[in-house]
Amino acid sequence: MIFDGTEKIIGHGAQAEVYLWKGFAYKVFRPDYPAEWIAFEIDQQKAVNALGLCPVRYEKTEDAHTIKMDFVDGIMLEERLNGGYKDGFADLAAAHRFVHSVEAAGTIPNLRESFTSAINSFSLPGITDAQKRRALEIVNAIPEEKRVCHLDLHLQNLMFLKDSKDAFPYVIIDWVNAREGNPIFDYARVFVIFKEFAPFIIDFFMGAIKDDLNKLQSKDAFHDAVGVCALLRLTEHNSDAVRQIVKEYLG
């Protein structure tokens, strides 16, 4: 992507940097990042738009490694919490309920199929075949549902709109992981991220989602789902903390 020098970097991650330029956000991926994965992310966002879950539009550009996006002029829920906001975890729980209230109707990939494929192709030193078999058993044992699962809905992916007049003044971003399936995996995924990076907030999160979890499954099912999500987390972030979660929850 060729900018004119007026662009401003507003975000960065392992795979891409995000720039603000002429009123739009531009996600610029590393040159070696597969173009077909970027095309999938655009298609995924269009599906989410159609389901009414997020108004942010993605568009292709002349550069296959750059996505043009609507700019969300807001602050992360994480920033609100750091500023002393007291209801952040209640808001995070409400965001999950909103996502799970929508049926995917086959418009996004199936969670069970995606997880099964990922586990079958999984290969990392120290991860045993027994752990993989156990993860596959769990994925197939937890009942399938047709609900949308974001699978990355943590404090940095919930944007507060300062000037919004809506009762729920947030926009949920970063939908590339979204799948159609059982919401218990959505909660388990966030639990793993918090346990890895901020274990001191787990009690706040679990307190906020307690009633929602009770409506879904037993405590054992959540425990099992955490093991699966931890195993898959290793494909993104192969850390000692995540390996410990795998050992604790999958054996």
What spans do the regions from the language model cover?
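ATP-binding glycine-rich loop module of kinase domains
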Residues: 5-39, 46, 78-80
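Conserved HxN/HPN-centered segment at the entrance to the catalytic loop
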Residues: 49-62
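Conserved short submotifs of the Hanks-type protein kinase catalytic core
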Residues: 63-76
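An alpha-helical support segment within catalytic cores of ATP-dependent transferases
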Residues: 101-151, 155, 159-164, 171
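Internal "kinase-insert"/substrate-recognition segments embedded within catalytic cores
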Residues: 83-112
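Helix-rich C-terminal or lid/interface subdomains of diverse kinases
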Residues: 180-182, 188-251
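Catalytic activation segment of kinase domains across protein kinase-like and atypical kinase folds
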Residues: 157-187
